Amino acid sequence: MSPGDFVRHPSQPDWGLGQIQSMIGHRITVNFENAGKVVIDGNVIELVPDEPAPR
């Protein structure tokens, strides 16, 4: 995964689709549709890759 990729949080489906903003070490900053900006510990949570719905 890298900045710009779309992901979902496996235990927070209500957060919606997120886009990775930055990755510094194991800290991943993701901007989620319904939760805003969240910093995830990549050592604890394995984000699930996804794609935005076609328009």
Where is each model-derived feature located?
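A short, compositionally biased
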Residues: 1-3, 23-26
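Short coil-to-beta transition motif at edge beta-strands of beta-rich domains
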Residues: 1-12
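Glycine-centered tight beta-turn/hairpin loop motif at sheet-sheet or coil-to-beta transitions
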Residues: 13, 33-35
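Residue-level detector of flexible, active-site-proximal loop/helix-junction positions
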Residues: 14, 27
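Short beta-strand-centered aromatic/proline hotspots
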Residues: 16-23
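SH3/SH3-like beta-barrel fold
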Residues: 28-32
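Intrinsically disordered, low-complexity, charged/polar segments
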Residues: 36-55
